[in-house]
Curated annotation (Swiss-Prot):
It holds the Pfam family Ribosomal_L1. The keyword Transcription does not apply. GO terms for biological process: regulation of translation; translation. This is Large ribosomal subunit protein uL1. Binds directly to 23S rRNA. The L1 stalk is quite mobile in the ribosome, and is involved in E site tRNA release. Protein L1 is also a translational repressor protein, it controls the translation of the L11 operon by binding to its mRNA. Part of the 50S ribosomal subunit. The keyword RNA-binding applies. GO terms for cellular component: large ribosomal subunit. The gene is rplA.
Length: 235
């Protein structure tokens, strides 16, 4: 078993890692335990009561975080004609049609998110095996396939986050930087949970929000009492 470093041991000194904390306290502890020398990202891991191997229990979507992610998002826009100008004016970092697709085929992946107009999707599909595994494939469900390409680009640049449940029924979603502080991170957290709750599949049975934890990039996982999350949403 790998040994944890001094910073990690120092971070967990006064924390019970087996306990479930009220969400506001959990967020404060998460920020407090971040001891790395860089501005760590705070993530939430959600265990959902779904079985993603069934298509009617897949949870996939996107949410615009009120305070963004605290980092520059590089966006690739697959489009042509006037839409290229629209995408560039909205702030897309890389814009093109077949030329950009060819570039990706040759190994170019220097972007964090991708958008496309519907008329480009047949061509973009040819690089689906490259984009898909990296979470970069444009998708209508997340608003990244649209003729309103300017809006799609603007939302991503402003901190729109895409998410998709994994095979184990777990969602990992970034909430922003530790330097945001507990209050802003809690605002972003609320936006994420709101979006996830709205996407609850009708086929999902039993408890939907089964467990969750917060953590910084290098820090310990702080377990969250899901009942306190429900109260947060109601409040």
């Amino acid at each position: 078993m790998a040994k944890h470093g001094k910073n990690y041991r120092e971070a967990i000194k006064d924390i019970d890692l087996t306990a479930k904390y009220e969400v506001s306290e959990a967020m404060a502890l998460t920020v407090q335990t971040g001891k790395a020398k860089f501005d760590e990202t705070v993530d939430v891991a959600l265990n959902l009561g779904v079985n993603p191997k069934y298509s009617d229990q897949m949870v996939r979507g996107a949410v615009s975080l009120p305070h963004g992610l605290g980092k520059t998002i590089r966006v690739a826009a697959f489009c042509k004609g006037d839409k290229e100008t629209e995408a560039r004016e909205a702030g897309a970092d890389f814009v093109g049609g077949d030329d950009l697709i060819e570039k990706v085929k040759n190994g170019f992946l220097d972007f964090d998110s991708a958008v496309a107009t519907p008329d480009m999707m047949a061509s973009v599909g040819k690089i689906g095996k490259i984009l898909g595994p990296r979470g970069l494939m444009p998708n209508a469900k997340t608003g990244t396939v649209s003729f309103d390409i300017g809006k799609a680009v603007s939302e991503l640049k402003a901190g729109k986050v895409e998410f998709k449940v994994d095979k184990a029924g777990v969602l990992h979603v970034p909430l922003g930087k530790r330097s945001f502080g507990p209050e802003k991170l809690l605002d972003n957290f609320r936006a994420v949970i709101d979006a996830v709750m709205r996407l609850k599949p009708s086929a999902a049975k039993g408890t939907y929000l089964q467990a969750m934890a917060l953590a910084t990039t290098m820090g310990p996982g702080i377990k969250v009492d899901t009942q306190s999350v429900r109260k947060l949403l109601e409040g």
